[in-house]
A protein has these predicted regions:
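Predominantly soluble domains enriched in secretory-pathway, periplasmic, or organellar proteins
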Residues: 16-370
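Bacterial N-terminal signal peptides that target proteins for export
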Residues: 1-2
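C-terminal motif of bacterial Sec signal peptides marking the signal peptidase cleavage site
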Residues: 10-14
Length: 370
């Protein structure tokens, strides 16, 4: 069985030796990283903001500061911490940056078009890790498996059109193939044991973006899609969390941004209007969920994402700032607000341009039992 993780193992067993002390492991987090996509159309490169919990300070452009001023690249999109390394997926530069999480210095730059091929490796999008490997999607229609010791390609899997998010469970990876919002998105299931890939058209899935798995149940964040060519395209469908059962998906709840911790989805819906925040508990009712309002003590101007620290349960909401025209400013720095697990406002931190993802500096601490 292959256990696939987003950042770090979350469950451990206590250890006891008849001749020695008893101890257990605890997941801890000492900071967060904000992936800032920049603005490709204005030639603003992306960056990484580091938040240190101990000092409560957000440091901008931490990658550039520790790598001789070198840019992170064009349109970074996702990242994670796995072991003693950090991995950042940089879409527009066709790279995955491998970074020492303590020194923030580059260990390796994986050039995805060289690793997979010019077409196959184009535009890496999202990443997960486990079992000594990272797995990332590319708009070339592939998932790559890369060894985290020698950074060599272990396997590549042909999936659907324009894959986005992915999630692992047991010996499988489920991939959301967006079809670039054209309405014909589908799901791929990779069997890591056999190397076989099943790409499945699913009734009710149009533009899938993320995959969540809880107790073996699969949920898809599916967005609206567009018919026709821009600027005359017409918006169709709805953005929602959907429960996957065979070749059919049924709506669980409205959602545009979502993150999951311990079987609970933390959700933002209608981000371009009057944003709504909620929590959908999938544990007691896996098919429909139990959705309740997430009462944040204060909101943000223009939500751009949500995530939850797996060690503390604290909630992070990304946002654009308000521009002079009264609308979201996509060309200047954004911000992130940090809340307690109950939704009480704690802190606000500035970010770079276009904050788009959060990941956490999670590790494991050994605790002696009394």
């Amino acid at each position: 069985m292959v256990a696939l993780l987003v950042s770090a193992p979350l469950f451990f067993t206590s250890c006891n030796d008849d001749n020695g002390p008893s101890f257990h492991y605890e997941v801890v987090s000492d900071g967060a990283f904000i992936v800032n996509s920049g603005n490709m159309y204005s030639s603003i490169d992306g960056s990484l903001t580091g938040i240190n919990y101990a000092s409560n300070v957000a440091v901008q452009k931490v990658f550039a500061a520790n790598n001789g001023g070198q840019s992170l690249g064009s349109t970074p999109n996702d990242g994670l911490v796995y072991g003693d390394k950090m991995y950042v997926v940089v879409d527009g530069s066709n790279t995955v940056e491998v970074i020492n999480k303590k020194t923030m210095q580059r260990i390796k730059q994986i050039k995805t078009t060289e690793l997979l091929g010019a077409a196959e490796g184009k535009s890496p999008r999202h990443i997960i890790a486990g079992n000594g490997h990272i797995f990332f999607t590319t708009y070339g229609g592939y998932v790559a498996a890369v060894d985290t010791v020698n950074f060599k390609l272990t396997a590549k899997y042909k999936v659907g059109s324009y894959p986005e998010g992915l999630a692992g469970y047991a010996s499988s990876i489920v991939v959301a193939n967006s079809d670039y919002a054209k309405g014909h998105g589908n799901i791929s299931i990779i069997n890591l044991g056999t190397g076989e890939v099943e790409t499945r058209n699913v009734e009710g899935i149009n533009n899938p973006q993320k995959v969540f798995i809880n107790n073996g149940n699969v949920y898809i964040l599916d967005w609206v899609y567009y018919e026709g060519e821009y600027p005359n395209s017409v918006e169709k469908g709805e953005s929602a969390i959907k429960y996957l059962a065979g070749n059919k998906a049924t709506k669980v709840t409205d959602a545009y941004y979502a993150s999951m911790l311990n079987g609970k989805l933390y959700i933002i819906s209608n981000p371009y209007g009057e944003a709504k925040y909620s929590v959908c508990d999938l544990n007691s009712n896996p098919y429909q969920g139990t959705t309740t309002p997430l009462n944040l003590s204060e909101g943000v101007f223009s939500p751009a994402g949500i995530d939850v620290d797996p060690a503390t349960g604290e909630i992070f909401v990304l946002s654009y700032n308000q521009g002079e025209n009264g609308y979201a400013d996509y060309y200047s720095n954004g911000y992130v607000k940090r809340y307690s697990k109950n939704g009480s406002y704690m802190y606000r931190y500035d970010t770079g341009v276009g904050p788009c993802a959060v990941f956490f500096n999670v590790g494991v601490k050994t605790i002696l039992d009394n």
